[in-house]
Swiss-Prot record:
The gene is ispE. The active site is at 8, 134. ATP binds at residues 92-102. This is 4-diphosphocytidyl-2-C-methyl-D-erythritol kinase. It catalyses: 4-CDP-2-C-methyl-D-erythritol + ATP = 4-CDP-2-C-methyl-D-erythritol 2-phosphate + ADP + H(+).
Length: 274
């Protein structure tokens, strides 16, 4: 049985407060996009699970892979046979696209459906939350306003980017998320929340729909700012970094012709948003 875990982008990301526990509260819109990995399982005649990862390399030991953490979380509640798991990575890691979190949540859904486990989406989302703050998003997989640590979701009725073209570029830059939060120059509520701005026409988002990480990370990594400007030069209605990076995305009315010389060393992907 095979599924295709998809990525997400952040539309705006406001870091609104630093908490007493050292973490930060955020306000951001999560939007699913059709950049996908492939995840397949089969029952195996053995005493333990086996995970094989292909495609884009990921910097994680097998036992640290979120797919394995998802299986272990389900095994604490249910008994099911050992599995052979094949994961083909197309979503780059360390990009702000939620690839690992998506893999974990799709694994939860896949095992549930494969073995007809008696657990609904709400219970599955609760398990997903124990794996990562944004993992529950991929259980419902619909556009939401994410608040608190990014795990409290408010639906966005009638909000859709369907029909727009999207381009993603990710340079070979690694950004440590904890360091990115530590380096923030702005922490606090802004005048308008992301879920209000996204209902405006997309070509009015520029300058309004802000990712707070850009202010601190762009001076440190000028290449990120250059790629964002390249997306605008290529005709983007809106362009931004997703999460704490290092992937950037642009939204276009038509299929864009990107500056190939500017992205020769980048991961790049384009599609129409369904």
């Amino acid at each position: 049985m095979i599924v295709f875990p998809n990525a997400k982008i952040n539309l705006g990301l406001q870091v609104v407060a630093k908490r007493a526990d050292g973490y930060h509260n955020i306000e951001t819109v999560f939007y699913p996009i059709p950049l996908t990995d492939a995840l397949e399982i089969e029952v195996r005649e053995d005493t333990c699970d086996r995970l094989s990862v292909h495609g884009i390399p990921i910097d994680a030991a097998t036992e640290d892979n979120l797919v394995m953490k998802a299986i272990l979380a389900l095994r604490r509640k249910f008994d099911f046979p050992p599995l052979t798991i094949e994961l083909i990575k197309h979503i780059p890691s360390g990009a702000g696209l939620g690839g690992g979190s998506s893999n974990a949540s799709f694994m939860l859904k896949l095992v549930r459906d494969y073995f007809s486990l008696p657990i609904d989406d709400k219970e599955l989302a609760a398990i997903a939350l124990t794996i990562g703050a944004d993992c529950p998003f991929f259980v419902g997989n619909r556009p939401v306003l994410a608040t608190d640590l990014g795990q409290v979701f408010t639906p966005l009725p009638n909000f859709s980017l369907s029909g727009l073209h999207i381009a993603i570029v990710k340079p070979p830059i690694h950004i440590n998320t904890a360091a990115a939060y530590k380096g923030l120059k702005h922490v606090g509520k802004r005048e308008t929340m992301p879920d209000e701005i996204v209902y405006m026409p997309v070509d009015e988002w520029r300058g309004k729909l802000v990712n707070d990480f850009e202010e601190s990370l762009f001076p440190e990594h000028p290449r990120l700012a250059e790629l964002k400007e390249m997306l605008y030069r290529s005709g983007a209605l809106y362009a931004a970094m997703s999460g704490s990076g290092s992937a950037l995305f642009g939204l276009f009315r038509e299929k864009p012709q990107l500056d190939k010389a500017a992205i020769t060393d980048c991961f790049r992907w384009q599609s129409i948003i369904p």
